[in-house]
């Protein structure tokens, strides 16, 4: 899926300057846009969110939502005792309210409020199993370009996106085992180390009506 997204983005980029000459006028003629978002941003890479936007000549507002799993494996042991492989699965969910303020035909300032969720069903520490649920709310801001083509398609590239954490909350639920203050502290620490998310070369592409 990621390769398909990158190939489509490359195709859009090649034709940006040819068919997106009047991006401002093309945006003005559209009522609704549907698309996808990806790039060098952990939440977008994992959740592959969909985009619903209401474009305008000077301002565009939108909604972003997606969910996906990040899976990793850890192998421990030795040739004499045998090897054990443990699979970790974290579910990442992206929800955003977004906007773009255009300073010309395509150059723009993207901004918005993001609500990110990271969930794990079975995190284990000292034989105590927990369910972790971490929620973060942050402000997003950046710089980018966006081209809207004569035939209805559009491509946005956010060259840089920063973030500022507004709030976060972790919910830790014991599922099995005997809980102690040490195990609970370890479970809570697992998620509260997370900082605001940022990224670069973030592609948004789709079609408008």
Feature locations, PLM:
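Extracellular/periplasm-exposed beta-strand and loop segments of Gram-negative cell-envelope proteins
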Residues: 25-27, 39, 65-95, 114-140, ...
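Hydrophobic, lipid-facing positions within transmembrane beta-strands of outer-membrane proteins
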Residues: 32, 44-50, 93-97, 137-143, ...
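Outer-membrane beta-barrel proteins and related beta-barrel translocases across Gram-negative bacteria
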Residues: 91, 101-102
